[in-house]
Amino acid sequence: MTLKDFTDEWQNNEPTVLVHTSGSTGKPKPLRVEKLRMEASARITCAFLGLKRGDTALLCMPLDYIAGKMMVVRSLVCGLHLTTVEPSGHPLRGLKEAPVFAAMVPLQVYNSMQVEEERALLRQIRHLIIGGGAGSSELAAELKHFPNAVWSTYGMTETLSHIALRRLSGEDATDWYEPFEGVKVSLDEAGCLVIDAPAVCAKTLVTNDIAEIATDGCHFRIRGRRDNVICSGGIKLQIEEIEAHLQPFVNSQFLITKRP
C-alpha cells in the first residue's frame, strides 16, 4: 500500500479502515477498525509524549499494517510533519537530520546502531518508540545509555498499535509498562493480561500474554506467552524468563522449548 492509497482511504466517507493483523500469533486476518478510534489513539500517544504541531515524524514502517497506518494518522490528527522513507532495515540511512518522533521494530534499531552515522541520528530522535516484537537484553542494555527518550510499546492491531509504554533509556528505564489514561488492565484465571481500553477498542480484550500487575493496580510487566509455559514437577515455568537468566552465560543463539 502506498501513502496515497491510505490517505485516499482515510479521506473517503467510510467510517472504518481495513487493516490486517500481523500474524505473529496465527494467520493474518482482516479487521475493520473505526477511524474515530484511530484518531483517539493518535491523540493519546501524542499527548503522552508531549508531541506538538509542527514536530517532525518518520514513517519507516509498511502501510499494510497498523503501525505504519497509525504514524500517518498521528501526523494528520496532531499536525506533525511526516517524512517517509522506504521500509528497510536501515531507516535512517540517507537522512540529514533526526526526526522528533519515530517508530521502529527492534531489527531496524539494531541495524542502525551498527553504523556510526545512523547511530548518531538514532540518539538524536527525541522520542523513539519500538514495537513489533521483543528486543534482546543486549539491545536494551545499550539503549539504556541513550540520552533521548526510547520507549518499548505494548499493544496489537486490535488496540490500534499500543496502549502502554515503558521507558528503555536513562534513569527511568523500567520493566513495567505504563498504560495510557483511560486504559485498565487485569488478569484472567490463567494469569493472562486483560485490556479494557474503550477509547480504542470496543470490547475487552483477553491476550495470550502472561503478565504481572504492580501493587498500584496500573503498571504491568510481561513475563511471556501463555503457550510458552512449561509445567515441571507441578511448577509452572516461563520459557522467556529461563532464557533471560541463561543468556549472559551462553555465547551463541539458543532457545528453550517443551519436550515433545
Regions found by a protein language model. Name each.
Residues 24, 132, 155, 209, ...:
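Active-site glycine-centered loops adjacent to acidic/histidine catalytic or metal-binding residues
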Residues 16-43, 50-52:
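Conserved AMP-binding A3 loop
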Residues 208-260:
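AMP-binding/adenylate-forming catalytic core of the ANL superfamily
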Residues 3-20, 53-56:
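Conserved pre-ATP/AMP-binding loop-to-beta segment of ANL
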Residues 148-190, 197-204:
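Conserved ATP-binding loop and adjacent catalytic segment of the adenylate-forming AMP-binding
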Residues 115-170:
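Gly/Ser/Thr-rich phosphate-binding loop
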Residues 33-40, 56-111:
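AMP-binding/adenylate-forming
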Residues 21-24, 57, 72, 102-103, ...:
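Conserved S/T- and glycine-rich ATP-binding loop of Class I adenylate-forming
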